[in-house]
Design a protein with these regions (language model features):
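The feature marks the mature, well-folded catalytic cores of soluble enzymes
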Residues: 1-196
């Protein structure tokens, strides 16, 4: 709620460039994920200031992991989430948001693939693509695993697990979301540049 606009990994470059253009700025602060910010910076001329925060799932992947996966699984296609460190994207075959990774698998149907992202994402894409062999070097997100159907049910029916947000914070957060939603809709999720 302390930002002017929010973004997703699908539209981060679009948001950075739109903000810079609208405010005639050559520098944008992109937080909290330093790796998404660094990977966005590689795709734009806008100077990006970042913060040393990271997703605890994606920051665990390394370029060495990619090398080991290629050695253990010859011919495997490596797809990386843009919140992975830049050196991972440099050795991956493709990088993009979760939607872009899912589209890649659906459209190109590689024989064998690795998704360098949270395990549940790989599970969902695998379920939609039964003809593709998924290698799963899983990193689990403990926070996402707390969101269960039972907890959602309890929240909706019984009012349990409710998170109360002060109205002033809600309004600022809504303004940041509204600013993002006002941007033109992208036709497809963004592909991130990779080194391969």
């Amino acid at each position: 709620a302390e930002c002017d606009i929010t973004c997703t990994s699908s539209n981060a470059v679009q948001v950075v460039e739109a903000v810079a253009k609208e405010w005639n700025a050559d520098t944008v602060i992109l937080v909290p994920d330093q790796y998404l910010a660094k990977n966005v910076a590689a795709m734009t001329d806008i100077r990006i200031m970042t913060w040393p925060g990271a997703c605890e799932v994606h920051e665990l992947f390394s370029a060495d992991d990619v090398d080991q996966l290629r050695e253990a699984h010859p011919g495997v296609v490596i797809l990386a989430h843009p919140e992975c460190p830049p050196d991972v994207l440099e050795v991956a075959d493709y990088a993009g948001s979760p939607a872009a990774l899912a589209n890649y698998v659906k459209e190109r149907t590689p024989a064998k693939v690795v998704l360098l992202t949270e395990c549940s994402m790989s599970d969902n894409v695998a379920a939609e693509n039964p003809g593709v062999d998924f290698v799963r070097p899983c990193n689990l997100c403990p926070h996402m695993k707390r969101i269960t159907l039972e907890n959602i049910y309890d929240c909706l029916v019984n009012g349990e697990h409710e998170v109360l947000i002060p109205e002033d914070v809600r309004l600022r957060a809504k303004a940041a979301l509204d600013a993002m939603m006002a941007l033109p809709k992208m036709e497809k999720p963004l592909d991130f540049e990779v080194g391969r």
